[in-house]
Amino acid sequence: MNEIEQRIAELNKLLHEYGYAYYVLDKPVVADSVYDQLLHELIALEEANPSLIFPDSPTQRVGGTVVEGFKKVTHDYPMLSLSNAFNEADLQEFDRKVRQAIGDHFSYVCELKIDGLAISLKYENGVFVQGATRGDGVVGEEITANLKTIHAIPLRLKEPITIEVRGEAYMPKKSFEKLNAQRADNGEELFANPRNAAAGSLRQLDPKIAASRQLSTFIYAIGGDGEIYGIDGHAEMLDYLEDLGFPSNKERQRCSTIEEVMAFIEHWTENRPHLAYEIDGIVIKVDRYAQQDELGYTAKSPRWAIAYKFPAEEVVTTLLDIDLTVGRTGVVTPTAILTPVQVAGTTVQRASLHNEDLIRDKDIRLGDTVIIRKAGDIIPQVVGVLIEQRPENSVPFEMPKNCPVCDSELIRIEGEVALRCVNPACFAQIAESIKYFVSRNAMNIDGLGDKVVEQLLRADLIHDVSDLYHLTIEQLVELERMGEKSATNLVNAIQASKENSMERLLIGLGIRHVGEKAAKIVSEQFGSMEAVMAATEEQLVAIYEIGDKMASSLVEYFSNDDARAVIERLAEVGVNMTFKGKKVEVVVGDNPFAGKTIVLTGKLEQLTRNEAKAKIEELGGTVTGSVSKKTDLVIAGEDAGSKLAKAEQLGIEVWNEDNLIEQLNLI
């Protein structure tokens, strides 16, 4: 190593140590001027010797090349959301269920719920290689370059391990105030709260903008099975993350009873204004992994954790108007237009009125002073009216008799609270149906946003979803803010969607009561759109998990001549009409996975956890996250922990990875 290489290595080491002390430990060991001087020296050396730039160099934090967009990434392990508690009764019920399942010998770990943006960080051999947003929990967006600008995120860990961690990126209150002051001076729109500011900063295409926003982070979990790192619980995991160099929130506490949990909540309800960052609640988790495994998961969240949300904030403001929108199924939804008001750190100008019955029951009128509540709900609610402040000339609000978009007569189906427009030619319904068709969970056509869809309809370029596949670059470049490159990308994305497996098309058709799961089940069972269209209600309800409502809705939809005509046109332009997944034909005795409940634990070498799960599910098995008496088989990789021990205790059959591969090869 020559003198320059040695100095660059020395500067990297010093700057990492100083940065860790400043941003993670909050205990600076040198003056800012000293740090800046060393950083500038390193920048100069790297500019003169670009081949000597380390991948984890502190200079990589200042922001790199502007990107064209964020690519989608699938999380190795889903980023599940938590169930919510809004009062002491909710927490008591959670505690009762936990004790009923695992007894009284356990403890909780209570942590502050940071009000920011959930992120996932991947490290290979100790080096930060990828960062992503939570997205929908399964698929997020890669924002590695922007996350590198957060000084609290280590670019190299203290051990050369491969690991994925989860955390919350946030904007400190002081950074938020400074940013909004700058935006006010520049005549720019202000951010409503630090959470929005953090999310907006991390979605900037230019990392230099993110770098200027002074974000920070707390890391609170390992993605996947923490036991493979020799950890047996959540509190120990947080200590382990700190030892690796990650910032974790120190304001946490182990509690033995729900009364201790409530005391912790009361303390931070009172003291949250004194924190340097925003919090919106407290997260409560059962500590030991073995007990977490015993409690298991619901479809959406773990049974061993809950998020207590601070009490709803209520404010009063004036109802200026009631806006009526028409959805893809024709439902007319009323929304309150309000004098802007701050609620729970957010500027609120619109609030949900749900339906005609709520407006009538609460006698909500234009000009009223109304009570707005916002808690765990994303959408604020109108919860009451101050009758004593009502204007003298007010009159009861009447829902219209006709559609606000197409003027067709509105109807109310028996048993429903909603008014509906049943005109299939209604502009709003067509627009919303096409937006749904192209959405991520359906045909997933990137670049075809709401405004583009509306422009295409108004330009008379499309009338239904089949027309999308006839669009040309020449037509698209005539649209507002649509250049040739964007038009080319959009046409390519539309054409690529033709190759989707049939279940995506079935989702995109927007058939009532038919969601993602039902669409996949029906597609797998029948194999082709033609077969589904010919199916009877009796054939459909005979399928496991397809109920009467779904079956009736499918038959009704496909008996409509207009719907069948659209599907025929889609087929004519080349949209795939068959199921592309593997249809399992189970032969008793030939397949050891079919109908079995299986748990994967430990580290697999020949397959990833997701690959193993997919293969087992293709063969009719169900993969769960916890071991119980209902488990048929546990497949244990290296460093398997409490799940393996519990399987042996319960006498459940256990395979190693070689057994799994051997059986897969026999099928």
Swiss-Prot record:
Residues given in the record as NAD(+) binding sites: D32, S33, V34, Y35, D36, S81, L82, E111, R134, E168, K285, K309
The answer to whether UniProt assigns keyword Zinc to this entry is: yes
* DNA damage among keywords: yes
The protein's superkingdom reads: Bacteria
Q: Report the EC number(s), separated by commas if there are several.
A: 6.5.1.2
- Enzyme class per UniProt: ligase
Biological process terms from the Gene Ontology for this record are:
DNA repair; DNA replication
Catalytic center at which residues? K113
Family to which this protein belongs:
Belongs to the NAD-dependent DNA ligase family. LigA subfamily.
By what name is this protein known?
A: DNA ligase
What high-level taxonomic lineage is stated for the organism? Bacteria, Bacillati, Bacillota, Bacilli, Bacillales
Encoded by which gene?
A: ligA
